[in-house]
Curated annotation (Swiss-Prot):
Enzyme Commission numbers on file: 2.7.1.33
The name this protein goes by in its record: Pantothenate kinase
Naturally occurring in which organism (per UniProt): Rhizobium rhizogenes (strain K84 / ATCC BAA-868) (Agrobacterium radiobacter)
InterPro entries documented for this protein: P-loop_NTPase, PanK, PRK/URK
HAMAP family reported for this sequence: Pantothen_kinase_1
Amino acid sequence: MTIATKTPTTPETLDIFQAKAYSPYYFFSTEEWAKFRADTPLTLTADEVTRLRSMGDPIDLDEVRRIYLSLSRLLSSHVESSQILFEQRNRFLSLNGVAKTPFVIGIAGSVAVGKSTTARILKELLRRWPSSPKVDLITTDGFLYPNAELQRRNLMQRKGFPESYDTAALLRFLSAIKAGQPDVKAPCYSHLVYDVLPSEYKTVDRPDILIFEGINVLQSRHLPADGKIVPMVSDFFDFSIYIDADEDLIHNWYVTRFMRLRETAFRDPHSFFHRYASITEEEALGIAEGLWKNINLKNLRQNILPTRPRADLILRKGKNHLIEQVALRKL
């Protein structure tokens, strides 16, 4: 573990990954982090990791050993501590027969940074703990407004920005989860048609752990002038993770993924982006660069990256798309 002592000259230069001595985080190299695995067993196979990873994500079994087994152990300790606190509070309140509400893990980060892979890997590792907890995974994509509504609000070019989400529905969902309600429905989203699927839902029925993944899940909200109470999505999290990387790396991963999709998913006639499959490579590259510059880069700078310091754990990736550094918030 390393903690440097260099002092920044202005607040604007602050970067938690410069490892300032006064930082609220501990910083670890992957080698240091891997040692925290202890005796945590590897319960995934190479084939399973390949199946779980997203397009362009090179995560393999070695990366699971280096990063995810220690993370699994850390999360296990947090879940166990939460259970102990739950039991102590029940004794304090003289409550009997009360079920514990789900432990919610939030995963945030830019488009194309690898959030979905991390979420799927964690889900499989956590559900294979000796206690066999019930683990569900929900993404925020389903809480986007349907395209018709985005068009009505003139927000199609800001899809993925905070205002493009039905925040009220999202908060109702998380409130129901944390209230311990059964059969809570989350809307489904199709990346093929690039839209919310009407009348299609995923039912979440009182899991032990819920992983909630999305680009803006750590986003704070402006306090209203009328003084009304405004909850934030992260208020419902028991633990939060931010997947981080340099801006230029995410840019490259996004464009590379777009060009690969042009050769695969975009060729499906039902794809929203089918029109991009028949244009020239140069034209497609120009479109990908435009989408990055005009939408995703702006969202990263304005809304996503500023939420990074709110995470309990930050996984920072290098140019090979693998994690190179870990930051864990101090208690």
